[in-house]
Amino acid sequence: MKRLWLTGYRSYELGVFGDSGEKLKVIKYSLKKQLNNYLDDGLEWLITGGQMGIEQWGIQVAQELKIDYPELKVAMMLPFSDFGQQWNEQNQGTLMTLKAQVDFCEPVIKAPYSGPQQLRQYQQFMLTHTDGALLYYDREAPGKPEYDAKAIETYQEQHEYPNNQVDFFELQDLANELAELENQAF
């Protein structure tokens, strides 16, 4: 798999507010493990959006991984041209910083937001420009990623498209693994 679509929960859906905390540490640990596996299998492009949460954290982790995998490229594909403009100043600043760090950043639709059809067009773009997905989503905890999960399932009916879903059970296992590793360090 050369091109991976990364998406999932927004930060508020996971109860993560700010740039630190145990939940965020576990999520970034998970992202690093997942992306390392993809990189070892030949991943060239991580393609994601700019949403606060899994997408932005994935970009941050990918930037760190570039030290060991300088061939990794990161693309931030935004659904529409005025994406993030309704956010507060701090969140807009984070988005601007990440936009400057990635290898490629463009809106899929070069017009301001006008309706939900743009989000469906964005999903279709992401599906047709990637070889598979890494989706942080748990069917037991509905949220925004549910729309992406449904779009992926519909696309899979006609196309070979691997979808690796990370659910809360897997995150809990990784939290336990990380705690064990941290305890061994002392």
Swiss-Prot record:
Q: Which HAMAP family match?
A: UPF0398
Q: What is this protein called?
A: UPF0398 protein LCA_0919
Q: Name one Pfam family in it.
A: YpsA
Task: Tell me the superkingdom of the source.
Answer: Bacteria
> Which InterPro entries did the record assign?
YspA (IPR010697)
Protein species of origin: Latilactobacillus sakei subsp. sakei (strain 23K)
Q: Could you say which protein family the record assigns here?
A: Belongs to the UPF0398 family.
